[in-house]
Amino acid sequence: MTFLDSSTIIEYLRDNQTVIDYLDTRQPWWTSTICVFEVLNGPAGSPNFDPIEERQTFSGVRALEFNEQLALEASRLQDASVKDGSELSHRDAMIAATAHSTGDEYVVADSDFETEPLEDVMEVTNLHTEN
């Protein structure tokens, strides 16, 4: 199982070959319901926007819901991050907690999660490439 950040899903949908090559052999794919929102937030406001139709473009990625146990884990991760001087956004703390709960690789395509407190407790792979 591979847990995908919204940045990774977006790059996959943009046909980023580095992301496609890395992910295609690492299914099943999971993400957070928060990441689903982040991906859908991009096209929101465009003509004829339909969130259900947009969600189908990445229907192969199953979403895990955020719950109280994950809220506690997000708080622990945020505490460690603040103490390290690398505070996460609220959403990123919630997403990181969800990823951590799976025990699997967390694949991102930006530098938001390259912090020691996160990398100490989970495997974070960054596929970010300069275009």
For the regions a protein language model found, what residue spans apply to each?
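A short secondary-structure junction motif
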Residues: 9-15, 35-53, 76-83
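Metal-dependent nucleic-acid phosphoesterase active-site entry motif
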Residues: 1-16, 31
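Conserved glycosyltransferase catalytic-site signature
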Residues: 6, 68, 90-93
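Acidic, metal-associated active-site segment
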Residues: 39, 89-105
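Acidic catalytic patch
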Residues: 60-82
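Acidic, PIN/NYN-like endoribonuclease modules and their adjacent C-terminal/linker elements
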Residues: 1, 100-131
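PIN/NYN-family metal-dependent endoribonuclease catalytic core
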Residues: 3-4, 22-47, 62-69
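A general structural signal for well-ordered alpha-helical segments in protein cores
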Residues: 36, 71-74, 92
